[in-house]
Amino acid sequence: MLEKILNSRSFIIFSLPFFLGLISVFSFQPFNFTFINFIIIPALFLVITYVQKRSKNIYRKKPYLRNLFFIGYFFGIGFFLSGTYWISYSLTFDENLKLLIPFSIILIPLFLGLFFGFASLFLGPFMRNNYSSFFLFCLIFSLTDYLRGNILSGFP
């Protein structure tokens, strides 16, 4: 059963954005490997266009939007799971707050990943495999990142 899941195409398509999100944190300090973004962002774009094109051909209805949402959501979970670990460090200074550490590690990335999920959901119907779609992809993801920072009063 597990072998069938691991060999399926959907497992690869949905786990790839998660690992891309995990790896993208290496472009920030203290690692500062900024060239990783030049690999990760086009790879995420290609995954979204592949799923959008493939799902439209298979379903011919609207369930492909759900797939696009989960691709962005899993990318966001991976990105914030590896990028917000520092919040748990601030909860270790008080004995009463140590109970919140598992919630801070799990629930914050699950919530913040929704922003990337809604970005890819909104982007889905407009996606083609060309330069203008890539520009729109970067614009929508930048806009949702800006909104995330302003909605949550400057949370990085």
For each of these PLM feature ranges, what is it?
Residues 2-156:
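Membrane-embedded alpha-helical bundles of multi-pass enzymes
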